Amino acid sequence: MVVIPHWHPSQNYGPRKKGGHPQLIVLHYTAMDTTEAALQRLCDPQHEVSAHYLISPKGIIWQMVDEAQRAWHAGAGCWGDIEDVNSQSIGIELANRGDHPFAEAQMVALEGLLRGVMARW
């Protein structure tokens, strides 16, 4: 299955630091009431947060940041020897409040997106 996300650009990104390239995929859930609210937040320059992708419970995928760029989804996080997770990862947000199961359509879309991301990097 080829995944073609809807392009919804965010201004909240920058260049990957120190020649970084994706080595990790970081999955988040939005903890927001709606997909639309999450999409708005991830694209609002006042909030200085973004992700490369957002997936709705219906399986709709939005891409907000080009994979070659550094999205702002992992804060100042580190993982093992990786001190700047944002520069070394692809961030994927799943629209979910966090208090109910993820929808089947969302998981199918995520699996397709993951296959594509892993093949590219």
Where are these regions (language model features)?
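Long, well-ordered alpha-helical scaffolding segments within enzyme catalytic domains
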Residues: 46-49, 86-91, 97-121
